[in-house]
A protein has these predicted regions:
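Amphipathic alpha-helix face/heptad-repeat signature
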Residues: 6-13, 41, 78-85, 130-133
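Short, helix-capping/interhelical loops that line the mouth of catalytic, cofactor-
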Residues: 2-4, 50-95, 99-116
Length: 138
């Protein structure tokens, strides 16, 4: 699938998140739920948004590091902040630079051994990852 199509698809999924947030009250957004392994809708949505933000921040430099997420509690507890962030991510995905494939280097924490692995990737592949990750968390 072309990179531009993936960017549009990612925006479609983020708009689904916006619609969900708009339908929830503050307590429903931020409260832990047994069905979400004692996590909240807000925590899952923050996690999704921060993966997209990592990609958007790293793409211009050619280096993406998903482990450097901000883990911003405001996004998981404040619906207004989440909606603002979702709109911002959607606008960034619409930029021309996010519609043309390019090579990326993705840094990954390899786990217990403390090593960081560098993997060659592309904007197209990382958009696919972020979309699949979003579907998983929705």
């Amino acid at each position: 699938m072309p990179t531009a199509t993936l960017a549009r698809l990612a925006s479609d999924y983020l708009r689904q998140g916006q619609r969900l947030v708009a339908r929830l009250d503050d307590a429903a957004y931020a409260s832990p739920l047994p069905a979400l392994s004692r996590s909240s809708v807000g925590a899952h949505l923050r996690h999704v948004m921060e993966h997209f933000t990592s990609l958007l921040d790293g793409a211009p430099t050619g280096i993406v590091d998903y482990d450097l997420r901000a883990r911003d509690a405001l996004l998981e507890n404040n619906r207004s902040a989440a909606i603002t962030a979702l709109h911002s991510i959607e606008r960034a995905l619409a930029q021309d630079s996010m519609r043309r494939d390019c090579e990326l280097l993705v840094l990954v924490d390899s786990g217990e051994c403390g090593m960081r692995t560098r993997s060659r990737s592309s904007l197209q592949r990382e958009l696919q990852f972020c979309i699949a990750h979003t579907v998983h968390h929705y």
